[in-house]
Every structure is written in C-alpha cells, then in structure tokens.
Amino acid sequence: EERQVLRFEADRIESGGLPLPTRTDGEAEKITEKEETYFYSYDACDGRRSTGKAKAGCRISAGVKAGGYRELGVVFSVCGAGVREPMLHSTGFRAEDGNPDIHTRSRAGVRMSWREMTAWQIIEEQKACRKELEERAGFSSDMAVCLAKSASQFIAKRESTGGDTILAGFPFFEDWGRDTMIALPGVCLSTRRYDEARSILRTFARYEKDALMPNLFPEGGEEPMYNTVDAALLFINCVWLYYDATEDLAFVEEMYPVMERILEGYRKGTRFGIHMDQDGLIMAGEGLDQVTWMDVRVGEILPTPRHGKPVEVNAYWYNALCIMAAFSRKRGGDGAEYERLAEKVRGSFAEAFWMEEKHCLKDVISGTDADTQIRCNQIWAISMPFTMLDPERERQVVDTVFEKLYTPYGLRTLSQDDPQFRPSYGGEVLERDLAYHQGTVWAYPLGAYYLAYLKVNGRNGEERKRAEEYVRDQMQVLESALREGCIGQLPEIYDGENPVSSKGCFAQAWSVGEILRVYEHLEKVSE
C-alpha cells in the first residue's frame, strides 16, 4: 500500500496535490486559499495555556535567535479547499421507522462495517447524523445549534444497566446521578430527544433505593453509590419537565410510585442523615459524607462543609412537593397532603434563610460561619419551576448574585470578599481540591442565573423584551468558549478571579445542557 507523502514548500504543505489546512505555534500569514478554523491549541487538562492559531492556506514562519533552537509544532488536516475535490460516496444508510435514536439508527442502518468504510463515508455519515440532530432540536442561533449537536456526545449506553445515560464530562467523569439530573433537561428535553430522556429516567428509577438515586454507577457491575441528597429530588423535577414538554401522562403514571417513595423517604429519614426536620425543611450530611454537589473531601478535611439544611436542597424539596401535588391532581387526586407540607416549607424557608442585611439567602443552616457565606447555590431557589420567595426578594437575590458572583463564563462558588475565597484553581491535587468550590467559577450555574434573571425581569412585555436582549448579548461572550479547550463544547470550570482559560473537564454535560435551556426559553418558550 502506498504511504502518504507530505510535501513541504515555502508557503504550503501538500499531500497528493491537496493543500492541508494547518495549525501552528508559529506566525501564520494568510495567503489566497479558503480558510476554515477547525483546530485550536490545547495541552494537558487543568493547565491549558496556549491558544495557537487555526488557519488554512497559510505561510508559516517562526523567529529564532542566533544560536538558538526552537521546535515548530504543526497540526494539519484535509478539507475540501484547494485544487481538487475529494471523492465522496454515499454512506448507504437509511432511517429505520420507529427508531428515533439517531446514533443507534445510523449504526444499525450502515450496510457495511466501520472497517469497510472509507474515511469520507464515515465523515458523510456523521454529517448526516449531526444535520438530523440540528433539525430535530430546532434552534436558530448558531451557538444553540452547535451546542445541540455537542449535547449528543454525552448520551451513551451503559452496559451494566442496559439503558441510556449521560456522561458527566470529558475526559474525567462517568455518569453521575446528580450531574445526569441537572444535564438531562437541556441535553435531552431542549433538543427534543424524548426517547433518550425516558430511557435515562427509567434506568435511575429502577435503581432507586431507600428513597435515593444512584450518585455513581461503578464499573464492573458493583453496587451503585448513593451518597447524594439532591439527585432524587432533581429526578422528580426531570419527570415534571419531561411531562411539560410531552404531556406524556402514561410515563408519569409509570414513575409515580418511585416519586412517592422518594418524598416519603425524605419525610421519614433515610441514609446520610437525610431527613425532614420539624419545620418541614430537609437536613442532610453526617460525619465525612458530602452529599451536595460541593462534595470535595480530602482525607478527613471537608473544604466546603454543608451539613445541615442546604439552600438549594430545600429549593428542590419544595419544588418536588409542588410537582407531586400537581401530578396527584392530574391522576384524579386532590394533592392536599403535598400542598399542606409545601406551604409549611415555604413559610419556614423564608424565615430561616433570608438575610435582610445582605439581600440574599443563606447558603446552609448549620449554626456555623458557613451559613452566611454568599454562594451561587441560592440561585436555584429562584430558577426552579416552583419557588418560595416573593417577587421583590427574588429580584434582590438575582441582583446580589450578579454583584458578587457573576461572570460571563459562569458563577463564582464564593464571593470574592469572603476570607476563604481562592482566586485560582491549579497546583497539586490538594491545592485544586481546596479551591474547587471556594471561588472557582463553574459554568453550569450560569444557566440557572439567566433563567432567574429572565423570570424577575420579565413580568411585563417591554421589560421581558429588554431582559431577553440583555441575556442574548451576555451569552455572545460564551461563543469564545466554544473555540477554546474543546471545540464546540463548554467546560467545567474557570479560575475565580480571572476566568479566561477553561479548566477541569474541557466538555461538561451540565454546562452545555443548562445553556441550551436558556436558548430554549429565548427561542421557543418566549415566542
């Protein structure tokens, strides 16, 4: 078999007469060719620094001092630019009736194995898959279209359960229960992948145990881990959002016994100190178990201890009670028991969590200094479908979050004026763990912030229009994030003080999903 021959000339790199688009850490001078920015520089996770250049049809040069030495890195790929068109062939697959899973259908419909297909056939098939994803999602803005296709990369089949799941992030994370329940509304529902949403929810419903949802499915068929207080409550929220999108009451009936067990278990008490207190609020956490999303543990050190009554958990609890009251009525009941408890929770929440002097909510009720720290967790008390605060207090929370925590790339996990604030995420594992939720910017809460902002600033027509324009303008900044790190994806985190370079996972499911929910609101719901 003839080997590929690369030809290097003064102003180009060729293979078989086809000019190759290149990326280099040298200086790129544009020449007359089609330009496509397909490639961006990256290096090891948690330390990406180089931005590089992405150019097609370039003359590449680099300066070297006398007697010096420099390696010039060049990454190139083939595209259709240049003197000849590549030979493209039909992929030979067709849509199978009754099978809406794009990836399954594509694989099942190919008439030859992957090994028998040419590179161009594989490329054309993937183009067709991505085109169908784009059309199904129905977004119009370029960023939303891109994210709708990127979202599909997180949906996977889990062999140990036999069902669909959502991988939390690349390259580090598997499918975490909490992450899945936060990501699912955007990754599946906003993109109209309802079959996958049902499959995922059925998988988790099957593994419900002691009123809890799995936090992690270990490899090798081992027993799932259940150390999460929020996944089960967010499961109920996902069923509600699924019903809101599909009006599939039959699926609600299927999930209803599971949801009943969850709320009953939280009322009576279950593992990890999770139980309802006398005031109706949920308490969680005991010993060294970290059961909220701020879950870092370093040996016997808990950098962000949140044992007690976490603010977002009680927002999820109230939301779940209201959802079950609504579902009960749709099934022919009156929902009175859930409504009475929800009303009790509503009164207790406002009294226990509101800080008049700071115009926002406490982060946790624990009797420690951590209670009054200003953190991003309070934003979910405004953005959930059912909330407890009056409109004026909701507006104050959104304003405080903007003033203390907002960046265009995400929300800080802790206010910069807090003595425990850590400005950067880096160094050894211990240093990173200690900074993980102590000021580090997380991308995914940004979706909840924008939804909350649209809620409190959208109570009449003109105000709503201005709010939507503001959010659209702010989200344009995120377009640069699609070109840094992993192309077309949104990352996990950024430094707290200067959030300009992504860190952690370069592609995070809940980051993508939550921004898709905002676009869904702007492009579909508001219309």
What are these regions (language model features)?
Residues 1-527:
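Acidic, mature catalytic/reactive cores of soluble proteins
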